[in-house]
Amino acid sequence: MPQKMQRRDFLRKSTLAALAGTGLKLAPAFAQASPRATVSPNDKVAVGFIGTGRMGQSNLATFMKHPEVEVAAVCDVYGPNLDAAAKIAGEKAKALKDFRQLLEMQEIQAVVVASPDHWHPLHTILACQAGKDVYVEKPVSVYLEEGRRMVEAARRYKRIVQVGTQQRSGLHFQKAVELIRNGTIGKVSFIRTWNYGNSFPEGIGNPPNGDPPQDLDWDLWLGPAPKVPFNPNRFGVHPDRWSSFRWFWNYAGGMMTDWGVHLLDIVQWAMNVEGPSEITAQGGKLYLQDNRETPDTLQVTYQYPGFVCVYENRECNGAQLDGHGYGISFHGSLGTMFLDRAGFQIIPEKTSKGVNLCEPVTEKSSNNHNLAHSRNFLDCLKSRQVPICDIEIGHRSTSVAQLGNIAYRTKSHLLWEPRAEEFRGNQRAGKMLSAKYRKPWRLSV
């Protein structure tokens, strides 16, 4: 029990420390949440689900494992996804095609958002305005300004907003972060993050534009994004593969924001930082001849105070790095830690006489990260305490990935002010921090 309490205290302090730099007084804001949303630990919690594709259905099944959760409604603009979610949710749940109908349901206390990335900001902000707490998938936004508005909405309307970077709820991730912060592998000066895959030879292909399926509201799917003809890859929802909308700039940010956010989130947590000071990127669409817009090969270098972090992705060669197809390697003066969802390993550096400079450690994953992460959200919904991945943290982690994409797209060496969230001396890059919404949609807090 004492060890568990120490770990809990570490997590609380590290989360609050990450938020302290924002200047926000979080505890009072959450303590003043409206009485309607404050529920006792034994009360049922009515939850609505917006976006019921592959990730949305996974979240639905996970939340339903918690005894207090009652699924009040499921919502999707695509009929097959909606029908599948309705079957999982059961007869009591309403099946809706327009998320605004879901937000009008007074009985709903919390909303789980797993819509396409370009919808995350509006779904979250409008849910906060409707008095709902929110669990939103990563990346929180496509544009950095959207993420900042999401933070503002959570604070203004006194909402609990948890971001779905579920690795933060993994016990071995928590221990790994604690070991890094405690100096177990010494001074960390270099970090590598990566995820590799092989989409050879055709990638997502080149389907022509055409008419949307009859059971898809294409205009509502596009929402604030520019109006364009339907293309199967721009929509790209399929239960057996990654949704291909992720490879188009108007809706997402490629692997950089899909996988990179997970990896960079842990880096910033372990190193107790809120953002880099310099960013450079190299890469391109170097092999695949499909109609994706995002690169199939990318390397981004982030300069932080005291260390360098690299993110690497390739979609044309899946060879693993030291047995890891994805992960994080922290390189310290005393040893190296390899960390992924399966566990972590510490490999000591040695003296000239072969003596280990730190203890070798191997630890495997020991809990269900998704279940623990949703549990944390539900507990905070009741207690009004800050969740383990509050929207401020999720926004910061997402923004690092967005900066990598901006460096790649502008071919610039970017100088960044993390606290002010602005570039120094690069107007072109600065224009890529915000989006122009298609009418009638507006980004308004």
Over which residues does each language-model region extend?
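Residues forming the Rossmann-fold NAD(P)(H) cofactor-binding site
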Residues: 57, 121, 261
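Conserved SAM-binding strand-loop segment of SAM-dependent methyltransferases
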Residues: 93-98
